[in-house]
Amino acid sequence: MATAVAEELLLAEERMLAALAYLQCAVGCAVLARNRETNLAYGRHASPSFRVRVPARAAWVVQELPSLALPLYQYASESAPRLRSAPNCILLAMFLVHYGHRCLIYPFLMRGGKPMPLLACTMAIMFCTFNGYLQSRYLSHWAVYADDWVTDPRFLIGFGLWLAGMLINIHSDHILRNLRKPGDTGYKIPRGGLFEYVTAANYFGEIMEWCGYALASWSVQGAAFAFFTFCFLSGRAKEHHRWYLQKFEEYPKFRKILIPFLF
């Protein structure tokens, strides 16, 4: 009796993880629709009406932490059967490397940074908790891969996209950080790297990263995360592009918003 109940609960969790992935896609569609009407309220687009704010460095550490802590917990757990498989370990490590950088390195490289509205920080914490659980739980308990999955073209191409996307993202962040010299204030036009082709090179890199992860994982959960990332960051990129065009008369008109030569 107890065994049957336990098996039913496990199957219920598997169905729930699939449902959460579809929910993430639905929320992504809602975010995409909302971004057509409303500015995204943090950074340079933050509304003055948001009075309660969190220092930028602290906000980044706190909001990204769940997506680092939850996978680490799964690695440490003795009840994570799928992490005995190399493909699962590598995929979860890909997720961890990104959030390790985002939580423990990126915030401490920031130069200044506007305080983040508490509401935006809270929503980011909620998302990172939701997605950190979804990805880590699926990979540690439910994702089944053949031992030779790491030689499958889908995994190899996906891993290559993930790595290239992360490098683009980190390099683009480096360019943005170094726009201002000590004592400088105000904004400048980013130049170099993929910024020669798009306004939001850092976002392009992150979207590429998670599309690669989705391909390598070949899962609904990975695809849902990549889709949500595109929905959220594409709206943010459009706001950036519009802002630069309004702010700088000399802004390069040939630059696309997010995807080189296309969009």
Swiss-Prot record:
It comes from the Eukaryota. Optimally active at alkaline pHs. The chain crosses the membrane at residues 16-33, 90-110, 115-135, 155-175, 213-233. It catalyses: a 3-oxo-5alpha-steroid + NADP(+) = a 3-oxo-Delta(4)-steroid + NADPH + H(+); 5alpha-pregnane-3,20-dione + NADP(+) = progesterone + NADPH + H(+); 17beta-hydroxy-5alpha-androstan-3-one + NADP(+) = testosterone + NADPH + H(+); androst-4-ene-3,17-dione + NADPH + H(+) = 5alpha-androstan-3,17-dione + NADP(+). The keyword Transmembrane applies. PROSITE patterns: S5A_REDUCTASE (PS50244). Keywords: Differentiation, Endoplasmic reticulum, Lipid metabolism, Membrane, Microsome, NADP, Oxidoreductase, Sexual differentiation, Transmembrane, Transmembrane helix. Its EC number is 1.3.1.22. InterPro entries: 3-oxo-5-alpha-steroid_4-DH (IPR016636), 3-oxo-5_a-steroid_4-DH_C (IPR001104), SRD5A/TECR (IPR039357). GO terms for molecular function: 3-oxo-5-alpha-steroid 4-dehydrogenase (NADP+) activity; 3-oxo-5-alpha-steroid 4-dehydrogenase activity. It is found in: Microsome membrane; Endoplasmic reticulum membrane. One of its GO terms (biological process) is cell differentiation. It is an enzyme of class 1 (oxidoreductase). GO terms for cellular component: endoplasmic reticulum membrane. It is a multi-pass membrane protein. Converts testosterone into 5-alpha-dihydrotestosterone and progesterone or corticosterone into their corresponding 5-alpha-3-oxosteroids. It plays a central role in sexual differentiation and androgen physiology. Belongs to the steroid 5-alpha reductase family. This is 3-oxo-5-alpha-steroid 4-dehydrogenase 1. It comes from Macaca fascicularis (Crab-eating macaque). The lineage of its organism: Eukaryota, Metazoa, Chordata, Craniata, Vertebrata.
